Amino acid sequence: MTESASTSHRFHTLDVFTGTAFGGNQLAVFPDAQAIPEHALLAITREFNFSEVVFCYPPQNPAHTKRLRIFTPGAEVPFVGHPTVGSAIALHVLSGASGDAEMVLEEGVGPVPVTIRALDNGAFFAQFSVAKLPEFGAQAPSRGKLAEILALDAEDILGAPSAPLGVSCGLPFLVVPLRSVEAVSRARLRYEAWESTLKSSWASEIFIFARDPDSGAAHYRARCFVPGLSVPEDPATGSANACLAGYLASRAVEKDGTLRWTVDQGVEMGRPSRIEIEADKTAGAITAVRVGGTAVFVTEGTLRLPSYTV
């Protein structure tokens, strides 16, 4: 096998769910990936070594903006939140637009509507509505088992009526409420315990959270462990926060209206992130879930992809 030539492909990197560079969750976006061969997509993702890389294609429905394919270092995934927010802002800015906008991004879960709002400081806030309303799975393993996985005490994990639960808005997460922000910071993923208990379960990725009493009743601190997708810890996870919105809304006493929460994630990783989540309820049923945040451009460049002949 000899290298005969190379092709060039433009990319941009952004930090998502933050208003400043070097915070939030890193993302690489290829605005036009049509010429990138299928077999190279996962290799490119691993080269960046970010939580996700997005490859953009013309939409199947011409009324939509783009079709997205989202890759983690482990596999392609049907839906992830921070690539949705980051890609929407990137595509909006790269199109030359400067004001508010609506777009629809085609992802593995289906069409994802996104609203973009221009902020006074020149940045943009993007909010997406989940294509799939929250689906609730079976109860989680015992608090003792979860404590072993998270290097915590069983007492750190809340029980009924706020027990851990599997939730999916397109990508399942085990949502685990903890008693304190201190417990959130203290948690550590024990991979072997995770592998023996959760790896083969429906909701194998873990999202832990606790109310932050210093920031208000609707403010939470969170962390996300995604070992099944080769991401030990993620600094900002829109899809998991969508699940959190579903979890909180399902337990809220309010039967109607819009519920809103703010989540800080990534603090322990040195990449602080802020995610805004909402859920609509009608007659006690969840009718919509939305996740939003800002993003900033960090780098841009050209990937030189070798072409090989045998």
Predicted regions and their residues:
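Active-site proximal loop and beta-alpha junction motif in alpha/beta enzyme cores
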Residues: 2-80, 85-310
